[in-house]
Amino acid sequence: MAHSRSAKKRIETIRKRTERNKSAKSALKTAIRRFEEAVQGDDKEQAREKLQKALVSIDKGVSKGILHKNTAARRKSRLTKKFNIITG
C-alpha cells in the first residue's frame, strides 16, 4: 500500500483513468460489433450507418489515447474492407 500522500493520490488517479478507459474501450468494441452484426445480416444501409459510427468511435479512441493511431488505421481499413465486400 502507498505510504506517501502523493502516492495515494496517484493510485486514485490511476483508478479513475482505468474506469474511464474501460468505458471508452467497451463503447468502441460495441460499435464495431454492431457493424459486424449488420454486415452478417446483409443490410447494406444499416451497415453503412454502423460503419460511420464505428469509424468515429475509433477516431475518438485515438484522440483519447486509448488506441495507437496505427492500430486505429488498421481497424478502420479492415472494417471498410468488410463493408466494400458486401456492397460489391
Curated annotation (Swiss-Prot):
Q: Name one GO cellular component term.
A: cytosol
Keyword Protease on entry: no
Q: Which molecular function term from Gene Ontology is one that the record holds? A: structural constituent of ribosome
What are the UniProt keywords, alphabetically?
Ribonucleoprotein, Ribosomal protein, RNA-binding, rRNA-binding
The lineage's top-level taxon is: Bacteria
GO annotations under biological process? translation
Which Gene3D superfamilies has this protein been placed in?
Ribosomal protein S20 (1.20.58.110)
Q: What family does this chain come from, according to its entry?
A: Belongs to the bacterial ribosomal protein bS20 family.
| PANTHER family cross-referenced by the UniProt entry | 30S RIBOSOMAL PROTEIN S20, SMALL RIBOSOMAL SUBUNIT PROTEIN BS20C
- What role is this protein assigned? Binds directly to 16S ribosomal RNA.
Name it.
Small ribosomal subunit protein bS20
Q: Which gene encodes it?
A: rpsT
